[in-house]
Swiss-Prot record:
The gene is Mafg. This is Transcription factor MafG. Residues 1-24 are annotated as: Disordered. Signal peptide: none annotated. The modification N6-acetyllysine is found at K53, K60, K71, K76. It comes from Mus musculus. Homodimer or heterodimer. Homodimerization leads to transcriptional repression. Forms high affinity heterodimers with members of the CNC-bZIP family such as NFE2, NFE2L1/NRF1, NFE2L2/NRF2 and NFE2L3/NRF3. Interacts with CREBBP; the interaction leads to acetylation of the basic region of MAFG and stimulation of NFE2 transcriptional activity through increased DNA binding.
Length: 162
């Protein structure tokens, strides 16, 4: 016996004594619309209707669970990829930070050397120039005295750290 559908399809319904159910495949049961299912269920006993609806619900839930698993795996892979990228960025920034700390230490050393030199020069009194050229030079100014020694001190400390 066939039950004609409003569309072009015809659903086959086997109803033989002792057989509860129809000749629907799982795929057909899951993919058919509610309207098609209701048309298919007409004329079946309540027990058969409940059984078919329960089977359909179970199959649909399996499909939903499978798609959720796929989605979860995809999201996990994406998050792991982002995590790896962020870890690389953290390592890069840590390396930059370490090199900047070294540069800062070198600059501090230069600054301290300059401060020490400035204190030394500031403490020494202005000495009048002596010797045959003294008349042309005048008194020695602390800022001009030993300017090359500052450069030497700073350069030697920087080279020692490199």
């Amino acid at each position: 016996m066939t039950t004609p559908n409003k569309g072009n399809k015809a659903l086959k319904v086997k109803r033989e004594p002792g057989e509860n159910g129809t000749s629907l495949t799982d795929e057909e049961l899951v993919t058919m619309s509610v309207r098609e299912l209701n048309q298919h269920l007409r004329g079946l006993s309540k027990e058969e209707i409940i059984q078919l609806k329960q089977r359909r619900r179970t199959l649909k839930n399996r499909g939903y669970a499978a798609s959720c698993r796929v989605k979860r795996v995809t999201q996990k892979e994406e998050l792991e990829k982002q995590k790896a990228e962020l870890q690389q960025e953290v390592e890069k920034l840590a390396s930059e930070n370490a090199s900047m700390k070294l540069e800062l230490d070198a600059l501090r050393s230069k600054y301290e050397a300059l401060q020490n030199f400035a204190r030394t020069v500031a403490r020494s009194p202005v000495a009048p120039a002596r010797g045959p050229l003294a008349a042309g030079l005048g008194p020695l100014v602390p800022g001009k005295v030993a300017a090359t020694s500052v450069i030497t001190i700073v350069k030697s400390k920087t080279d020692a750290r490199s």
